[in-house]
Amino acid sequence: MSSVKIANKQLGPGYPCYVIAEIGINHNGDIDLAKRLISVAVAAGCDAVKFQKRSVDVVYSAKELEQPRPNPFGDTNGDLKRGLEFGQEDYEEISNFCKQVKIDWFVSPWDEASVDFVEQFNPPVYKIASASLTDDALLQHVRKTGKPVIASTGMSTYAEIDHAIEVLGKENLILMHTTSTYPAKYEQLNLRAIPTMIERYGIPVGYSGHETGIPTTVAAAVLGACCVERHITMDRAMWGSDQAASLEPNGISRLVRDIRLCEQSMGDGVKRVYEEEIPVMKKLRRVGAAA
C-alpha cells in the first residue's frame, strides 16, 4: 500500500498517525477564538487544524435560511449560518497565523465555490465531509485541484464509498471511517471497520471521531488509522452545536500523548528478552526451574 503525502508528512503504514484538530465552526464566528484554538492544537502536538467552508446561499435553500432560529447573530437560520462563516480577511489571518506557529491547516469545502475560494491559500489537502461523499460534482471539482483528498464515510454504504472512489480515483486518497452522530455511542463506533476498509480498498484509512472521551480514538490509531480527527473546544459548555462532542485543551493533549506512547510501544513484533529484564529474571526465577 502506498502512502499519501500531506505537506511534509507521509500518511500510511509505518508512519506516525497524523492528528487533526477539527475546529470546524467551534470558533463561533470569532477569529480570536479561532486563533486560541489553533494555539491549543499546536501546544497539544497536533499536525493540523481543520475548518469548514460553505457558500451559505448555495448550500442552503432560501426556505431553510428563512426558518426562525434565535441565535447570537439574529433570529433566523440564515443569520446563524452567515454568522459562522469566515471571509477573506479571516482566512488570511488564519493562514498567516498557522504559518507562524507551524501547523498545517485545511478545510472541508461544502461546495465548488468554497474550493475555489480556499485554493488561493494553497492548502496541503482537502477533506470531503461525510454529508458530501455522494456529491459527485464537488468530488470532481476537488480532485481537479490535484491536492490529496481525505474523504469521510459516515452514513455511507460500501456502494456509495465504491462510487466515490470511482469519481476521486485511489491516487492520493485517504478514506476516513466515522459514525455521523453527535456525540456517537460507543457501541456504534465499529472500529473494526478500519482494518476491514484497509483490506477492502488497499489505501490508507483514518478515523474521524464524534464520541466523548479519548480511549476509542487511541484504539483507532492502534487498529491502523493513518490519521485521526477530533473536534476541539475551549469548553464543552460553550454555545454551539458541536461543542459537546469536542475535546477540551487537556483532552486533545492527552489524545496526542497517548497515541504517541502507543506508537512507541508497538515494537517490531519479534519476541525477545531485553537486557533490562535479565537482572529481574535472575532475581525472581527459581533456581533450576524449567525455562
Which residue stretches match the model-derived regions?
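Catalytic cores and adjacent flexible loops of soluble metabolic enzymes
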Residues: 1-291
